[in-house]
């Protein structure tokens, strides 16, 4: 007989301390085996679409551990979000909704899906209206950066897939797009501390990984370069980069790294990139980054 677990979702789930803490709590509470889990959305009236990447990774983990789960009490706004970004059609019998230009559909990639991942990010993110203008070379280099961030998550996390989902918010006071990449694997904290033989906190290990040139990679693969390029784009664009891993949550905003305090532990890595839409800057590549073998 399966144990029934009721999970009540908060009123608003957004990419902030409370939102990431909720997912960390959720992973800790429900990723046991042989349960029947009901996700109750009756009080939840907002759920950032890009965070479906985290929920999807958690649900796949539940399935692997012989749990079954159901959704109930959906309010219209979260329901529409989950329907339009294809999340519901993956996890329920809902028919696939028409593709919506304001969503970056829920997707997961394997390590060997490099081409598929780059095509997906290019089409779903950079080819959409309102995105920052970039030269061909700059766009290629930024795509590599984003892919490097994803692949780092996979190879370092030693997990099977990286999960991705995104949402355009053209009607916000400051219109923006958010895209999240998630893997429930090893944490940045474990990787960096193993590499350095240290006992740094979650935040300090994320800051170490964000420092140009630092990498836990071995062999000839470059590390750190992609992140630097991505940080530059985010700073010029006035967007933000959030990284959550273990007990760490660091956010790059307005050229400053903000360290947040997490109550709960996330056993993997979440990376959320936010870019402002309608940016009047045009981006070109100032240095000759090796952009061969990208596409």
Identify the residue ranges that each predicted region occupies.
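Flexible, glycine-/charge-rich segments associated with ATP-binding catalytic modules
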Residues: 1-31, 92, 97-98, 196-200, ...
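Amphipathic alpha-helical interaction surfaces in cytosolic regulatory modules
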Residues: 8-91
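A generic structural signal for beta-strand entry/edge sites
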Residues: 36, 174-178, 268
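Short, well-structured alpha-helical interface segments that form or flank functional binding sites
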Residues: 50, 137-144, 148, 176, ...
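Conserved ATP-binding N-box helix of the HATPase_c
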Residues: 58, 134-170, 228-234
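P-loop NTPase nucleotide-binding core
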Residues: 80-112
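Helix-loop-beta hinge of the Bergerat
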Residues: 104-134, 189, 196-214, 230-232
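ATP-lid-like helix-loop hinge signature
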Residues: 152-193, 256
